[in-house]
Amino acid sequence: MRPILLSGHERSLNQIKFNRDGDLIFSVAKDKIVCAWWSANGERLGTYNGHQGAIWTVDVSPNTQILATGSADNTVRLWNVKTGECIKVWDFPTAVKRVRVHPPMEADCWPVTEKRMGFLGTIAVLDINYGENLTEQAEEPSLRITCTESKATVAGWSYMGKYIIAGHEDGSVSQYDGKTGEQLENVQAHEFDHQINDIQFSADRTYFITASKDKSAKLMSTRNLAILKTYVADTPLNSATITPKKDYVILGGGQAAMDVTTTSARQGKFEARFYHKVFEDEIGRVRGHFGPLNTVHIHPAGTAYASGGEDGYVRVHHFDKPYFDFMYEVEREQLRK
């Protein structure tokens, strides 16, 4: 499984995303630009320029028409994917750490803002117009959720936009009503005061995986926030994703970036870890990055995954035949029946 190495950023990666078709990858880093790549061969299509600070987050609409980014310059920007034109800028009082586009095409985009300078962290819902005139967008959020106790660090939409699921700085996970913003549930999923760094959903959005500084990832139900599975690692985790074709999850993390120069790549545990989704066993690791993995994302068809690291590189791995052939004995017996 030889990786394709994508070198287009001067600083560490913050987030990478495949589009729904899986033919494009979008990456953002601390260097103010958004890169678009062909996933098949790693060729760079182009960049989106305009932010004045580190870009923390990126997401793309299901039809790959609109790209949304959030930055340390306190703005959310909407881009026309095809032309690279910035079509809308929303200003916020603090940095925008996460932005998500709701899967249904007619729905919303929303940012998670930082708790800083006297401002509380918020989750804001922005209505997106997918019509012919993309520049005509709403000026103000249609819904704003204020996180009074512990700031939200990551969040995502559930199935049908019924809930907003948020991960918090104190290791808890909250469920909010998608229409009113009312908090319905709050569960201490991870150790107290160990921040949740990532939440990624299954294809049908009925369950999701968290990645936390407490060296574990949790598979949780969207409906009631029940913890379904726990994957224990030996290093703090920054990102986790669920593979659609095989029953695996991929975790990414590593020793804290400030300690990286004092250690070798192996000691730093800078590897993508593969766990069996059902049995919770670690089944393999993929090395390559020199520095922690900050973000991992799976191809929608489950045929490849991409990882972005503190070293400034994106690595795209297309899975070989042995990846798809590997099965536990109990899985083989199930097929024989």
Curated annotation (Swiss-Prot):
What superkingdom does the record give?
Answer: Eukaryota
Q: Name one GO biological process term.
A: formation of cytoplasmic translation initiation complex
Q: Which GO terms describe its cellular component?
A: eukaryotic 43S preinitiation complex; eukaryotic 48S preinitiation complex; eukaryotic translation initiation factor 3 complex, eIF3m
Please provide the record's keywords in A-Z order: Cytoplasm, Initiation factor, Protein biosynthesis, Repeat, WD repeat
Subcellular localization is given as: Cytoplasm
Q: Which InterPro entries match?
A: eIF3i, WD40/YVTN_repeat-like_dom_sf, WD40_repeat_CS, WD40_repeat_dom_sf, WD40_rpt
- Membrane-crossing residue ranges in chain numbering: none
Name under which the protein is recorded:
Eukaryotic translation initiation factor 3 subunit I
